[in-house]
UniProtKB/Swiss-Prot annotation:
Residues 1-14 have a biased composition (Polar residues). GO terms for cellular component: mediator complex. This is Mediator of RNA polymerase II transcription subunit 19-B. It holds the Pfam family Med19. Its main location: nucleus. Component of the Mediator complex. Residues 1-29, 168-240 are annotated as: Disordered.
Length: 240
């Protein structure tokens, strides 16, 4: 490979193998040997007398152009409600009157929040439209001026008395669930009814109860824990 390259460009073999930059694969460019004349390309050959294009023109920069992107209709300036024809839905949901007051949703906020702020001049719009007139410099408050900020015991105004009282909760009546009718009981057979009647008769028989009591008494007399048996033992031992 080196012999072929040296024969083409007239370089001796002592320079070593050509690197990638010499072959045109790297960042560098192959050096044109001085012995060889200017290279002519087929498309550069023209008639005699016409100016020949220089080979250096091939190394000039060039630009690639493409079509510009289409303009997007949706921008930050467009109104999406009118773009998607949602004006009717917007007016339907935003113009709906709410039955419940604002205090029901925000019970912990102090003050009368149900009434508009225009009545007592506490709205933020009033600060924007009519800002308070004040000096540029701030001066500390004196002791006489601080007396107006002291808290004094006294009755609360009527509008603040019911501030901490929560409205009574509505009692929801429990709905009684209607039970489904159970399956009808099977009719009693005559054998079952006779057996139940016999049990009732046995329980209600007074003679039977007396017999049970007598049996219990006899068992208690013959048992060693009976007090009569313990008292009879020393008498028998004394007779012996």
């Amino acid at each position: 490979m080196t012999e072929i390259f040296s024969s083409l460009y007239g370089q001796p073999d002592s320079q070593g193998p050509a690197g990638p930059s010499a072959l045109g694969f790297g960042s560098g460019k192959p050096q044109v040997p001085q012995n060889m004349g200017p290279m002519c390309f087929p498309h550069q050959m023209m008639e005699e007398g016409a100016p020949v294009r220089k080979p250096a023109a091939m190394n000039e920069p060039f630009y690639l152009l493409r079509e510009l992107p289409m303009e997007n209709e949706l921008t930050g300036h467009t109104n999406l409600i009118t773009h998607y024809n949602l004006e009717h839905a917007y007016n339907k949901f935003c113009g709906k009157k709410v039955k419940e007051k604002l205090s029901n949703f925000l019970p912990e906020l102090p003050g009368m929040i149900d009434s508009p702020g225009i009545q007592d001049n506490s709205s933020l719009r009033s600060l924007i439209e009519k800002p308070p007139v004040c000096n540029n410099s701030f001066s500390p408050l004196t002791g006489a001026m601080l007396t107006g900020f002291r808290l004094h015991t006294g009755p609360l105004p009527e509008q603040y008395r019911l501030m901490h009282i929560q409205p009574p909760k509505k009692k929801n009546k429990h709905k009684h669930k209607h039970h489904r009718p159970q399956d009808p009981l099977p009719p009693e057979t005559p054998s079952d009814s006779d057996h139940k009647k016999k049990k009732k008769k046995k329980d209600d028989d007074p003679d039977r109860k007396k017999k049970k009591k007598d049996k219990k008494k006899k068992k208690n007399r013959h048992s060693p824990d009976h007090p009569g048996m313990t008292g009879a033992q020393p008498s028998t031992s004394s007779l012996r």
